[in-house]
Amino acid sequence: MTRARFTHRAGEYTLRVTGHADFHSGSDIVCAAASTLVCTLAATLDALDADVTELRLQPGDAAVAALSGPGVRTAFLMACTGFQQLADAYPENVQFT
């Protein structure tokens, strides 16, 4: 199961993603979608020159955190919307809180 958790505290946005979706061995489209969302968030924050406070992109263990700034909220909202859609479509494989 992939678990994605979003938090916003004291002007810092954080998205942590752990685990594997285990949708289909060898061609896991759910894991691929989750990876795409996290990597796109990281790339967007880089393009925004955001103040990134944590960046970890490892298989089964990712974290992206940034201080509030222009475009940062929107970038995290995009990623969170994607994870909510994944969780709705694949509830046995993705959990989003």
Protein language model features and the residues they cover:
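N-terminal intrinsically disordered, cationic/polar leader segments
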Residues: M1-S27, C39-T97
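Short, conserved glycine- and acidic-residue-centered signature motifs
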Residues: V30-A34
